[in-house]
């Protein structure tokens, strides 16, 4: 029974998982979230109040 011999399919299985575990974290870590906290420090908040002519 060839399915009981682990040599051919086990190495393919291990290599496939090694490739997936190497590629997927890179894809996840390269994803940029739009609402990071470090973006708040780049813009200086305005210090003047708004002018509302109707109030």
Curated annotation (Swiss-Prot):
Sorted alphabetically, the keyword list is: ATP synthesis, CF(0), Hydrogen ion transport, Ion transport, Membrane, Mitochondrion, Transmembrane, Transmembrane helix, Transport
User: Where is this protein found?
Assistant: Mitochondrion membrane
- One biological-process term from Gene Ontology? proton motive force-driven ATP synthesis
Membrane-traversing stretches? 4-24
Organism superkingdom: Eukaryota
> What Gene Ontology molecular-function terms does this entry list?
proton transmembrane transporter activity
How does the protein's chain sit in the membrane according to the entry?
Answer: Single-pass membrane protein
Gene Ontology cellular-component terms listed: mitochondrial membrane; proton-transporting ATP synthase complex
Where is the major localization of this protein?
Answer: mitochondrion
Question: Whom does it interact with, and what assembly results?
Answer: Component of the ATP synthase complex composed at least of ATP5F1A/subunit alpha, ATP5F1B/subunit beta, ATP5MC1/subunit c (homooctomer), MT-ATP6/subunit a, MT-ATP8/subunit 8, ATP5ME/subunit e, ATP5MF/subunit f, ATP5MG/subunit g, ATP5MK/subunit k, ATP5MJ/subunit j, ATP5F1C/subunit gamma, ATP5F1D/subunit delta, ATP5F1E/subunit epsilon, ATP5PF/subunit F6, ATP5PB/subunit b, ATP5PD/subunit d, ATP5PO/subunit OSCP.
Please describe what this protein does: Subunit 8, of the mitochondrial membrane ATP synthase complex (F(1)F(0) ATP synthase or Complex V) that produces ATP from ADP in the presence of a proton gradient across the membrane which is generated by electron transport complexes of the respiratory chain. ATP synthase complex consist of a soluble F(1) head domain - the catalytic core - and a membrane F(1) domain - the membrane proton channel. These two domains are linked by a central stalk rotating inside the F(1) region and a stationary peripheral stalk.
State the family named in the UniProt similarity comment for this chain. Belongs to the ATPase protein 8 family.
Q: What is this protein called?
A: ATP synthase F(0) complex subunit 8
């Amino acid at each position: 029974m060839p399915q009981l011999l682990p040599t051919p399919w086990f190495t393919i299985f291990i290599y496939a998982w090694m490739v997936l575990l190497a590629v997927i974290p890179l894809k996840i870590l390269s994803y940029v979230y739009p609402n990071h906290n470090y973006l708040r420090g780049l813009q200086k908040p305005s210090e003047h109040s708004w002018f509302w002519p109707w109030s």
